[in-house]
């Protein structure tokens, strides 16, 4: 993982207006390597916009983003090595759980041996081993969210895993358990 520095970033979805409205007012923040952070605020305050700026899905109107003191503001999303887990699970429903987890590695032409080792390791960590051969569409919402998280963890070159309200679709009884799992995963992968 990486140290991430947000240096005076801001974002307006209508920057060319005479009086632009900012979804994200200028601010600075540093996320230290290996730490967990929670971004709290009311709906519409810019939390998702900020995460999308860090991942490269959205370009800031002003400011710089640094990963380990390297300016990545102009880098494309795929060059930033960020994994993002969204509010609703993003999975390939026609693929098996194994193939969902393997997808990021296969796209980067990793060998079958490395794919097998990483997928099995992450599946073990996320308690998905017994589901590897099942179609992803047959899993529960919380298991699908674990697949989304697993696709981020399967790559060893990920600078950070950003989660945008990842527990929204999770059954209330399972939220506590998943929070504990996320804490353990952070300790393991930092």
Q: Which sequence ranges carry the predicted segments?
A:
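ABC ATPase C-loop
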Residues: 153-154, 161
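Conserved ABC ATPase signature
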Residues: 74, 135-139, 143-145
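Hydrophobic anchor residue at the start of the ABC signature
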Residues: 149
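The feature captures the beta-strand-to-loop junction immediately N-terminal to the Walker
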Residues: 40-42
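Conserved ABC transporter NBD signature motif
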Residues: 63-71
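Short coil-to-helix segment of the ABC ATPase nucleotide-binding domain corresponding to the Q-loop/switch region
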Residues: 95-104, 135
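Helix-to-loop junction immediately C-terminal to a conserved catalytic motif
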Residues: 55
């Amino acid at each position: 993982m990486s140290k991430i520095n947000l240096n005076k970033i801001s974002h307006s979805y209508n920057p060319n207006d005479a009086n632009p409205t900012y979804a994200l007012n200028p601010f600075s923040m540093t996320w230290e390597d290996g730490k967990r952070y929670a971004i709290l605020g009311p709906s519409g305050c810019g939390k998702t916009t900020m995460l999308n700026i860090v991942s490269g899905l959205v370009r800031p109107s002003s400011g710089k983003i640094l990963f380990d003191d390297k300016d990545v503001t102009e880098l494309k999303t795929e060059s930033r090595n960020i994994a993002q887990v969204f509010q609703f699970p993003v999975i390939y429903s026609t693929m098996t759980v194994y193939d969902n987890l393997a997808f990021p590695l296969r796209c980067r032409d990793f060998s079958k041996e490395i794919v097998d080792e990483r997928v099995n390791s992450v599946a073990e960590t996320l308690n998905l081993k017994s589901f590897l051969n099942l179609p992803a569409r047959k899993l529960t919402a919380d298991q699908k969210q674990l697949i989304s998280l697993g696709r981020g963890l399967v790559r060893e070159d990920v600078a950070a895993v950003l989660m945008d309200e990842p527990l929204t679709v999770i059954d209330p009884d399972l939220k506590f358990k998943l929070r504990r799992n996320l804490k353990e995963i952070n300790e393991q992968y930092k």
